[in-house]
């Protein structure tokens, strides 16, 4: 109805985990989004808190930080391996679920990850197997909830990017959820939301609106900052 008001006609995109046949594909940890290991940490943090909402009140706890750090290392490895060719969330989950001896051998081959993983390697080489397995399980068990062919398919493609208000390629994105699968979908949606918030709240972009329904069902990192600062960047929430 209002497409004539855009200099470039916007693309209409949908994320639908229930029926991937009616969904576009979008990789929320596309290598282009990850310019520093801090970006990988944020992605890992969002997904783990999305799966364990109570962890948001326990930042700094050993068994909260451990899975976040481990997942961060895996995501960053995928980012720097072959220029991010396999940097998708499904690849990260599958790598995490390999034998930990194989995983740490692969990760420690990267000098930039040695210090990041020192606590895990010390436990491994020091014979603290129970502690190490507990650390790894605290990442594996929550993430196992989102091992799904539908989620894997949607989250591993690049039909569109999340810079929705890009003047050269504007997009209208509709993201669907399902209250019956809230514990599964909310974590994945939280990752998309955090990425969108970072990309749209910038100077030089088109006017943009964010409409959120049933907000309490998802962890939306950065929403408070978006509300506080978005007006200057012509973003309405």
State each model region's role.
Residues 1-236:
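P-loop NTPase motor domains
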């Amino acid at each position: 109805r209002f497409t004539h008001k855009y200099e470039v006609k916007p693309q209409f995109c949908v994320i639908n985990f229930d029926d991937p046949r009616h969904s576009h594909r979008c990789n929320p940890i596309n290598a282009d989004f990850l310019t520093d290991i801090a970006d990988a940490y944020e992605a890992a943090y969002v997904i783990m808190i999305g799966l364990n909402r109570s962890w948001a009140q326990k930042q700094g706890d050993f068994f909260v930080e451990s899975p976040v750090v481990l997942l961060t290392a895996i995501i960053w490895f995928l980012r720097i391996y072959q220029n991010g060719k396999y940097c998708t969330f499904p690849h990260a989950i599958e790598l995490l679920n390999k034998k930990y001896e194989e995983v740490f051998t692969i990760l420690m081959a990267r000098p930039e990850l040695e210090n990041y993983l020192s606590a895990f390697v010390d436990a491994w080489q020091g014979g603290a197997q129970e502690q190490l397995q507990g650390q790894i399980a605290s990442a594996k068990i929550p993430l196992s909830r989102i091992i799904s062919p539908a989620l894997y398919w949607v989250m591993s493609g690049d039909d569109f990017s999340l810079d929705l208000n890009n003047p050269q390629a504007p997009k209208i994105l509709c993201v669907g959820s399902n209250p019956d699968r809230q514990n599964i979908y909310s974590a994945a949606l939280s990752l998309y939301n955090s990425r969108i918030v970072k990309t749209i709240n910038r100077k030089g972009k088109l006017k943009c609106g964010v409409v959120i329904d049933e907000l309490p069902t998802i962890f939306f990192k950065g929403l408070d900052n978006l509300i506080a600062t978005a007006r200057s960047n012509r973003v309405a929430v």
